[in-house]
Amino acid sequence: MALLTPLPGSVRHGLARISGSLFIQNKTRDCGEQHAYQSGHDLLSSLPLQMMLYFNAFFFPFWIISEIITMELKFGRLSGYYQILLTTSLVILTLVESLRLYIGYVGNLHEKVPELAGFLILTLLIQLPLLLFLLTDNRNLLLPLDLAVHMIYLMFINAEIVISFLVLKTMTRQFALEYYLQQSEILVSKHVPVNRTLLRFQNTTTSIAEQYGSDALMY
């Protein structure tokens, strides 16, 4: 059963455009690569990423409990400014993590580019900076328990960034290629002349995203 996405249509469209611009419209490196593309659809979901998300989801409640314990121990020793800053950081991390893991699960398992792109953006722009702040700022009075759970969490984050980037790159190009080939087959079936150079995906100088927009990445 397909899971519902929490992302609005406009957000999904924007994320699809970002993914297309990053992984399809690169005319320097991508166009020079030689690949044996096939028209059939391959399974693009990543088992390592799904395993990371699964174990991350189980680990995160222990991370929250550990942070509550350490906050209770050191809260009175923090300055008023850092009490607010630390509390806000933990609340944001907790709220964003629930959304991040869900859209990462949906994006990877159901091969949805916008959700996977949103997962990567949330990881890079929110979770990773906040976690590094908690881990490196000595004025937070880092305790051994803090250090242990933060390091484990950081390993999850780093692995998910690398794997999701590679999966998103492969997924975006594959879907764009399938969409492009589908449109080419429609033109051929209607006896519309198709420029032979356009049928060679790796040598085309006009990006697929510019020709067809981000429709291929929305589903």
Curated annotation (Swiss-Prot):
Keyword Magnesium assigned: no
Keywords: Cell membrane, Cell projection, Cilium, Cilium biogenesis/degradation, Glycoprotein, Membrane, Transmembrane, Transmembrane helix
Cell membrane recorded as keyword: yes
Protein's name in the database: Transmembrane protein 17B
One Pfam family recorded for the sequence: Transmemb_17
Residue spans crossing the bilayer: 51-71, 84-104, 116-136, 147-167
Species the sequence originates in: Xenopus tropicalis (Western clawed frog)
The family this protein is said to belong to: Belongs to the TMEM17 family.
Main location: membrane
GO cellular component: a single term: ciliary membrane
Subunit structure as annotated in this protein's UniProt entry: Part of the tectonic-like complex (also named B9 complex).
GO biological process: cilium assembly; smoothened signaling pathway
Localization (cell): Cell projection, Cilium membrane
Membrane topology: Multi-pass membrane protein
Glycosylated residues, chain numbering: 26, 195, 203
Protein task: Transmembrane component of the tectonic-like complex, a complex localized at the transition zone of primary cilia and acting as a barrier that prevents diffusion of transmembrane proteins between the cilia and plasma membranes. Required for ciliogenesis and sonic hedgehog/SHH signaling.
